[in-house]
């Protein structure tokens, strides 16, 4: 009754767990559908946003082009205004220079006139002075002559000799000659003064003319340089004019259409560049958002892995409880069988004694009865041998089941440590990503571009391991539950001939996974041959009780694990290959400098290195 209640309770719990799993799957599907809908809506919104941003960028670009055109027009107008201003300034400077030249020329003419007037004034003053001096001299001479004439007239009246008269006449003549000579001397002096005055005037005029000449030479040099510049500019303009005329006359040249085509292409390429920039910015934002979501998911996965590693597996506990209950039931069945065998042995011992007594009483029997007795004795001996072999096989099966349980225990402890290490590794990777995003945001894109395998979450490993362990456990229990009234297959007969040394060597050389997968394979690797099957029949009274207590037959337990072994072999081979790859990667990392990246399935040995 207690066993039935526990079975009902376990079935009820199993049913509730199945219902919860169905609900969780339903809710998960709903969440996936809602997430896909939200993802589609987000994609549509992103497309709309990129379209609007692209349109706004195109409008911005067109407005910028208009502003640039207006700025160019304004610059052209300002340049024209500046050119006009420069032209006006140049014309004003030319006018000023011309006025200065005219003023300078008029000033020079006035200076010339002034110099001439000064020279004439000096000459007039000199002539006036000379005339005054001459007048004074003439008046003095006249006064002297009048005095002499008066004296002569007075002396005329006096008597004088002729010699005296001649001498006086000579004297007068000499005096007149002297006066004439003095007059000539004065005239020459006057002439000399006039010549000196004219010489000074001429020297001053010469100096003025030299200065004018130098100024005119400077003006001529400036005019010549300006003329040369004008000639060069004229030549350049003439060359440009000739080139423009040749291009206009050339039919192959496209002229302004080529520039217009180039401008159109440039504007089109700029529009495409703007659209690509907008799309790149939107994709960059989407990448940042997805990276944040991946970061959060990694944190959640790390916490879940740590929680799952810290908690014990309820399926494992239930399975162990079921195994304990099954073992208890097996012990009870074995005790009942021992009692039944003792009773049957006592009956068999009493049977031959009674038959021997009857034989002595009856006397001589036929030869046929003796033959049957001999056959019965031989069959009983064979039955004893088979029972001994069966007990030995049971002990081997119990040892194998104990070994399987120990290996399962080690496997589950390793799985728990693996999950804990995976959680710690995930946390370390999350912290590493945070530090890289904080201190080296530009290096994240370079690291992301490295080739790496797709990361898979190790959530199904526990299910595979538990299925493999359950199948191995059921096989071991099936072998241990074999009784003389049950059917045994060829695999059970092959296990009888395996020595203990071969089993120990095979378990030492092979991994636990190979021990679990290949319990029936001989050590030489050859497939087992078909052997004869031995079927031992017992009373019908004992068989239904055994079938009730242990409904699983040996054939069922031997056939079902075979299929599960074949399924689990591929999985465990993959696990072995992954372990070898991890060992090779660890050796290469020990040789090469360490590179921090996110692997697909982190191993426990990589945690201390990172």
Swiss-Prot record:
Keyword entries, A-Z: Cell cycle, Cell division, Centromere, Chromosome, Coiled coil, Kinetochore, Mitosis
Cellular compartments per GO CC: nucleus; outer kinetochore; spindle pole
Family: Belongs to the Spindly family.
Gene Ontology MF terms: kinetochore binding
Organism: Xenopus laevis
Biased composition (Polar residues): 549-561
Positions of transmembrane segments: none
Protein's UniProt name: Protein Spindly-B
Subcellular localization: Chromosome, Centromere, Kinetochore
Function recorded in the entry: Required for the localization of dynein and dynactin to the mitotic kintochore. Dynein is believed to control the initial lateral interaction between the kinetochore and spindle microtubules and to facilitate the subsequent formation of end-on kinetochore-microtubule attachments mediated by the NDC80 complex.
Domain of life: Eukaryota
GO terms under biological process: cell division; establishment of mitotic spindle orientation; mitotic metaphase chromosome alignment; mitotic spindle assembly checkpoint signaling; protein localization to kinetochore
Annotated stretches, region: Disordered: 474-610
Biased composition (Basic and acidic residues): 493-511, 535-548, 570-583
Coiled coil (residue ranges): 1-392
Signal peptide annotation: none
Entry-linked InterPro entries: SPDLY_chordates, Spindly/BICDR_Dynein_Adapter
